[in-house]
Amino acid sequence: MSSAPKPAISYWHLWTDADGVSHQSRCTMTEFKKAAIAPQAAPQWIGAKTKVAATVFITVLPAGWIGDWHENPKPQWIIPLSGRWFVESMDGQRVEMGPGEISFGEDKNTRNVGGKQGHLSGTIGDDPAVLMIVQFEAPPPLASPCRFR
């Protein structure tokens, strides 16, 4: 492992600009250090991205499910475990994701623009989407795309 390069892990970031409009940016995490996660564990690449209280959810979106326009309730990492889902931001960008793809949602403080506020999300295809959500007890910064490196 000593010759392995540092990882580069991509994620989608749903964020709010200074005008209250949500956007999605494709970002890359590259800040990792090689360390053991426990005293007797072998070294591995670790990138601590948040250090606040968190709640973990597993949610199942039924096939054909489409939610209403809404903001993320709190900043949250969302990782599909199975199935596919989409997120559409207020700027009209639609991102489709499947198992293992990562999204960070923090579209807080958006304003209603033509009936759209926050984002729209739903499932794709004939299968439910199983999502793992790690939700944080921290307010998001405004207009900070790709803030996790």
Question: What feature does the model see in each segment?
Answer:
Residues 35, 110-121:
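Short, Lys/Arg- and Gly-enriched loop/turn segments at beta-strand edges
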Residues 71, 77-99:
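A short beta-strand-loop-beta hairpin characteristic of the jelly-roll/cupin
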Residues 1-16:
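Short acidic, Pro/Gly- and aromatic-enriched capping/linker segments at domain boundaries
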Residues 60, 91-109:
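Short acidic-glycine-tyrosine-enriched beta hairpin
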Residues 140-149:
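Acidic/histidine-enriched, glycine/proline-rich intrinsically disordered or flexible terminal extensions
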Residues 70-71, 119:
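Histidine-centered active-site/metal-ligand motif
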Residues 16-68, 129-131:
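A short glycine-rich, His/Asp/Glu-containing loop-to-beta-strand
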